[in-house]
Design a protein with these regions (language model features):
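A glycine-rich beta-to-alpha transition motif near the start of alpha/beta enzyme domains, typified by
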Residues: 1-84, 133-244
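Ligand-binding beta-strand-loop-alpha-helix segment within the catalytic cores
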Residues: 94-96
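Short strand-coil-strand connectors
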Residues: 72-74, 91, 116-120, 216
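Beta-strand scaffold of nucleotide-dependent catalytic cores
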Residues: 88, 124, 190
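Short, conserved active-site entrance elements at the starts or edges of catalytic domains
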Residues: 102-112, 150, 154-159
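Internal active-site segments that recognize and position negatively charged phosphoryl groups
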Residues: 109-141
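Glycine-rich, mobile lid/loop segments that gate access to catalytic sites or pores
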Residues: 85, 92
Length: 244
């Protein structure tokens, strides 16, 4: 139940942004259906990094180089590039305001918000399996996301709430990001935020079809040409048993 997930997600417990369920014992091929919960106990449609982790488990278990993962709204195809690197095909981004979703029909590429007296210009909203808004700024770490992140996440324009990314272009191939994750809070990494940022950078003609998205810890390579693909490392931390 959600209370148990919230308890386990606390940093003085297991500590996680997402908990993902799939029946490993029933995996006889390299395919699996997954259910994803944020650390606030709510079920969500997508988790890019979590899906790559599941893909590595499937590839290791089945001794195959490919895996197929079914989420609540997408079929994701993964490839094991090396022992600890997984590429995940995320499908096409969604730009339709009703499907992002937004609460009103406005230009999703140029969303201006006044948040706690701070003017935020030309936010780009899209859906990459879950809803995101990306603001390109001069210094992505100048903003206090612990303060303004939840205000943007819960803004009336976003009926299903939204993930928030402040992005800073370093050069033609590298972007730094600071991310407030819907239902999880300030995060050190978010796969779908990396995907959203890569798409927005391309659409704004800031980068080409491929770019590296840098978080506080590590980076992901995003390629976008109609479809999105995300490549990055996966590492085992610890195997534990818990009672649910």
């Amino acid at each position: 139940n959600s209370e148990k997930i919230i308890e386990l997600g606390k940093r003085d417990n297991i500590g996680f942004d997402q908990m993902i369920f799939f029946d490993e014992d029933r995996v006889t091929s390299n395919k699996a259906s997954i259910t994803i919960f944020n650390s606030d106990g709510k079920e969500v449609d997508a988790c890019g990094n979590g899906s790559r982790c599941v893909a590595k488990i499937l590839c290791d278990k089945t001794k195959k180089e490919y895996a197929v993962i079914e989420t609540s709204n997408r079929i994701l195809k993964a490839q094991k590039i090396s022992e600890n690197n997984i590429r995940l095909a995320m499908g096409e981004p969604i730009f339709d305001w009703k499907k992002i979703p937004l609460s009103e029909n406005i230009d999703h590429k140029k969303i201006n918000l006044n948040i706690d007296g701070i003017e935020l210009k030309e936010g780009f909203a899209l859906n990459v399996g879950n809803p995101h808004i990306v603001f390109f700024v001069e210094d992505c770490f100048k903003y206090d996301l612990k303060k303004i992140g939840p205000l943007i996440e819960n803004h009336k324009l976003f009926p299903e709430k939204i993930n928030v990314t402040f992005a800073e272009k370093k050069n033609a191939n590298n972007i730094s990001v600071n991310v407030w994750e819907r239902g999880a809070g300030l995060t050190k990494a978010c796969g779908t935020a990396a995907c959203a940022t890569g798409v927005v950078a391309f659409e704004k003609k800031l980068t080409g079809t491929g770019t590296n998205i840098h978080f506080k810890e590590g980076f992901l390579n995003i390629e976008y040409d109609v479809n999105i693909s995300m490549t990055g490392p996966v590492s085992d931390i610890k195997e534990i048993a818990i009672k649910l």
